[in-house]
Amino acid sequence: MLSRQALLRPARVLNTQVRTYAAAAAASSKVKPPVTLFGLDGTYATALYTAAVKTSALEPTAKAISSLGNLLAKDPKLASILETPTLSPADKSAIVAELQKSVGVSNETVKNFLATLAENNRLGLLPSVVAKFSELMSAARGEVEMVVTSAQPLDNKTLNRLESAVAKSPYVGSGKKLKVTNKVNADIIGGLVVEIGERTIDLSVSSKIAKMNKLLSEAL
């Protein structure tokens, strides 16, 4: 876990090569992202994707960004540090250097991307940019995200059975592959809530109780 002291210690301002990154992204007009993203975080994610394609470094970039996502998930305090509005140029340089060191980034595209965020005072966007970049990669790989919400964690056997059943259904297009995630929410009491792309199948106990309560209230 990164400490605040480690991130904010005095450091030399990095030679960021921001212009190199911007030029690579701008020159990628012939690269068409698999999906259109909106918002400032979507703009940065798309620029990173197109720059990575242009420099033939898409998979290494995806691996590095995934590592950054894991780091951010394990260290919630890091996000608040990134959002600090009073960071000096030296602080930003130190943060970028520590992020690169922590995830073992040697990819120039990612280095320049992080430097660009720092240069533009947008390091606070990093968590959402990572999420948006993941959307781009899933679309590029032909993946359909399936989120299974349960009251308790599901074992791999159960998840595999669900994946096999849904993969054969009309919910998943031909040639697509499922990317399964299990989320835990005790509020659903029992059962499952399955989200496939933009579709939701609510088989939770809480949903059934809500429907029953509605029927009872209408009958009274």
UniProtKB/Swiss-Prot annotation:
Which family does this protein fall into? Belongs to the ATPase delta chain family.
- This protein's source sits in the domain of life called Eukaryota
- Record HAMAP family: ATP_synth_delta_bact
- Which named protein is this? ATP synthase subunit 5, mitochondrial
Gene Ontology MF, one? proton-transporting ATP synthase activity, rotational mechanism
* Compartments where located: Mitochondrion; Mitochondrion inner membrane
Q: What does this protein do?
A: Mitochondrial membrane ATP synthase (F(1)F(0) ATP synthase or Complex V) produces ATP from ADP in the presence of a proton gradient across the membrane which is generated by electron transport complexes of the respiratory chain. F-type ATPases consist of two structural domains, F(1) - containing the extramembraneous catalytic core and F(0) - containing the membrane proton channel, linked together by a central stalk and a peripheral stalk. During catalysis, ATP synthesis in the catalytic domain of F(1) is coupled via a rotary mechanism of the central stalk subunits to proton translocation.
* Keywords, ordered alphabetically: ATP synthesis, Hydrogen ion transport, Ion transport, Membrane, Mitochondrion, Mitochondrion inner membrane, Transit peptide, Transport
Q: Keyword Mitochondrion: yes or no?
A: yes
**GO biological process entries:** proton motive force-driven mitochondrial ATP synthesis
Q: Output the Gene Ontology cellular-component terms.
A: mitochondrial inner membrane; proton-transporting ATP synthase complex
Instruction: Please name the InterPro entries in this protein's record.
Output: ATP_synth_OSCP/delta_N_sf, ATPase_OSCP/d_CS, ATPase_OSCP/dsu
Chief place of localization: mitochondrion
Question: What gene name is given for the protein in this entry?
Answer: atp-5
What is a single Pfam family found in this protein's UniProt entry?
Answer: OSCP
